[in-house]
Amino acid sequence: MQFPSLSCGILIKRYKRFLADILLPNGEQITLHCPNTGAMTGCATAGDTVWFSTSDNPKRKYAHTWELTQTQAGDFICVNTQRANQLVQEALEKRWIAELAEYQTVLPEQKYGSENSRIDFLLKADNQPDCFVEVKSTTLLTENGLGMFPDAKTERGQKHLRELAAIAESGQQAVIFFAILHTGIQRFAVAKQIDPQYAALFEQAKNTGVKVLAYKAQIELVQGKPEAMNLQFSCEI
């Protein structure tokens, strides 16, 4: 996945969930749109480098969108949650996900389930049951390279696990796919200490046959500037 042309600045602060102030190299201070409603723990530390895209849409109140954080330790974190589904769709269509490479058709945003949900991707293949894939953007790095999800309690995430478990029980394929968008993460676990109910439902879903996958994003740099990101390598669970 190619990034739009990116510029950078130094993070001053994130506030009101959707906004962030940064300082540009020329000394100008600007406000960005932050496309991430989560806690963003470890992703929004003052002094980190922010990489942002710029829209030419004159109707936008804030023309700039926060795409990546480059931490002072040198890690890159994709904070634009919309990129997770774009990455996974590209990986599915290019057959980079070995466990799902047999599926020829990738349908995004399909309605399903008894709780009025939308699945991120419905996969179809000849002579195979349909496969329902729910994507979770993962950016929380705890310690020793361990990444975790969720970074806050998530009733929506709990609903998705119930829906996936019901799909698996019906005889169809169900997958929860953790897109690891922090280059410092080397392995993955569910954050039981943050959301015990999510962790319990996660174990129940696995026991009903829901498959768990975690793949790590790779950032391609050109002269130190992020140019592209792809999702080709699995992450230890």
From Swiss-Prot:
Spans through the membrane: none
Pfam families, per the entry:
SfsA, SfsA_N
Q: Could you name the domain of life of the organism this protein comes from?
A: Bacteria
Q: What Gene Ontology molecular function terms does this protein carry?
A: DNA binding
Q: Which InterPro entries match?
A: Glyco_hydro_1_AS, SfsA, SfsA_C, SfsA_N
Q: Which family does it belong to?
A: Belongs to the SfsA family.
Q: Please name the PANTHER family in this protein's record.
A: SUGAR FERMENTATION STIMULATION PROTEIN A (PTHR30545:SF2)
Q: What is this protein called?
A: Sugar fermentation stimulation protein homolog
Please name the source species.
Actinobacillus pleuropneumoniae serotype 3 (strain JL03)
